[in-house]
């Protein structure tokens, strides 16, 4: 083990002996956008073409331990002989241009401050070490994307883990940021080490807007059936997938319900990066059933392309 990595693990072990804290100190409030809807209504809407112009953007290349991305104790992973290793992954941001409501992004991409990721002041030294931050290779900044789109009217997060909020610093203060319920309040000992970083990455966000999922776990975001938020808890309590009905067909952005291509193709949930592994497996199975029911859907896992 590298000496610095050993130090980090000692610090983390010490943190685990302490009371936990929330993921962030940023305030939350119930989102006013969207309406609760039954699952069957979403299924029926998929049959019609959608008005949204969709584009998937590669924000950065990266590499992190496979054991965080994938449950290596799953029988399929064991049978495949998968071992922990540094796994090449990508950070994506998705742009949604709605002809009536404006330009939105799913997740936030990479801020200009990460062009020299190893020296980014928002990320603490311990988090840089733990998450291989110096290995980030930015391909597109959120500032560049915002100029290309002519502005960004809102951000729909799949969850508030660091790698999904790294682009918010390029947006103007006051741009609304939407996330699932419970992510901000989630208590964990590891947040002792990560909360400062999360707060700094959310510095332009005065209040997080939390989706108000009902019993169906489905929200019709714009009220016109063009974009659906799907509660997919497990990786985090508020993890949310988004189904966009677009000019290029239905697009399902699943966040980190599974990070990798192998995970999606084999139905294996994330590993140590998930808050609740069994719940992750349930949510992943639900999203896979949706994709089987509607084979026209293009699926986008969190950090690798299919």
Where are these regions (language model features)?
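Core dinuclear metal-dependent hydrolase active-site scaffold
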Residues: 56-57, 81, 86-88, 93-98, ...
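Metallo-beta-lactamase
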Residues: 21-151, 180-231, 249-255, 275-295, 297
């Amino acid at each position: 083990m590298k000496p610095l990595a050993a130090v980090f693990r000692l610090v983390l072990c010490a943190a685990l002996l302490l009371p936990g804290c929330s993921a962030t100190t940023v305030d939350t409030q119930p989102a006013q956008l969207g309406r609760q809807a039954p699952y069957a209504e979403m299924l029926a809407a998929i049959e019609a073409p959608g008005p949204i112009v969709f584009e998937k953007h590669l924000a950065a290349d990266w590499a992190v331990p496979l054991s965080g991305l994938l449950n290596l104790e799953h029988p399929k992973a064991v049978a495949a002989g998968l071992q922990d290793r540094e796994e090449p992954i990508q950070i994506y941001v998705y742009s949604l241009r709605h002809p009536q409501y404006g330009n939105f992004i799913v997740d936030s991409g990479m801020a200009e401050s990460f062009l020299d990721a190893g020296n980014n002041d928002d990320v603490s030294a311990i988090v840089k070490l733990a998450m291989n931050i110096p290995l980030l290779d930015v391909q597109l900044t959120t500032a560049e994307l915002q100029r290309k789109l002519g502005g960004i009217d809102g951000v729909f997060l799949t969850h508030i883990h660091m790698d999904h909020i790294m682009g918010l610093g390029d947006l103007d203060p006051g741009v609304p940021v939407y996330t699932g319920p419970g992510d901000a309040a989630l208590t964990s000992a590891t947040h002792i080490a990560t909360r400062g970083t999360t707060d700094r990455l959310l510095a332009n966000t005065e209040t997080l807007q939390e989706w108000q999922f009902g019993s169906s776990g489905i929200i019709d975001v714009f009220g016109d059936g063009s974009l659906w938020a799907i509660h997919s808890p497990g990786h985090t309590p508020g993890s949310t997938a988004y189904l966009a009905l677009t000019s290029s067909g239905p697009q399902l952005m699943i966040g980190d319900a599974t990070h990798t291509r192998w995970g999606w193709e084999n139905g294996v949930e994330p590993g140590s990066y998930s808050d609740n592994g069994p719940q992750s497996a349930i949510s992943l199975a639900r999203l896979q059933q949706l994709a089987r029911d509607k084979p026209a859907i293009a699926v986008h896992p969190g950090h690798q392309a299919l």
